[in-house]
From Swiss-Prot:
PANTHER family: D-DOPACHROME DECARBOXYLASE, MACROPHAGE MIGRATION INHIBITORY FACTOR
Gene Ontology MF: a single term: phenylpyruvate tautomerase activity
Positions where N6-acetyllysine occurs in the chain: K78
Enzyme class, UniProt record, top EC level: isomerase
Modification N6-succinyllysine occurs at: K78
Primary gene name: MIF
Keyword Acetylation: yes
Subunit structure: Homotrimer. Interacts with CXCR2 extracellular domain. Interacts with the CD74 extracellular domain, USO1, COPS5 and BNIPL.
Taxonomic source organism: Ovis aries (Sheep)
Binding locations of substrate: K33, I65, N98
Pfam annotation, one family: MIF
Record protein name field: Macrophage migration inhibitory factor
Classification lineage: Eukaryota, Metazoa, Chordata, Craniata, Vertebrata
């Protein structure tokens, strides 16, 4: 159930077609979880600053049941910062990513939970 959310001040017109699909496929590969369970939400056009500057920036979160922790998070950070830098032209030092390990009983899906 990985869920990746990107809040950014990058305008919608600058979000390339295929970005969500690319993020889905890359996260499926990185987490080892099926793409059919991965949700990606990119929220452009946000009023945001980072370090007092309104240059392109992103505040992100990656939620997952398991597959979250030290070395994995560093790998995800490298992957996701790289994609956001390449596709949205956001400098990696203007991206924060929060990693959240979810309890399966606290994640609902398809009328039940993952527990």
């Amino acid at each position: 159930m990985p869920m990746f959310v990107v809040n950014t001040n990058v305008p919608r017109a600058s979000v390339p077609d295929g970005l969500l699909s690319e993020l889905t496929q890359q996260l499926a590969q990185a987490t080892g979880k099926p793409a059919q369970y991965i949700a990606v939400h990119v929220v452009p056009d946000q009023l945001m600053t980072f370090g007092g500057s309104s240059e392109p920036c992103a505040l992100c979160s990656l939620h997952s049941i398991g597959k979250i922790g030290g070395a994995q998070n560093r790998s995800y950070s490298k992957l996701l910062c790289g994609l956001l830098t390449e596709r949205l032209r956001i400098s990696p030092d203007r991206i924060y990513i929060n990693f959240c390990d979810m309890n399966a009983a606290n994640v609902g899906w398809n009328g039940s939970t993952f527990a």
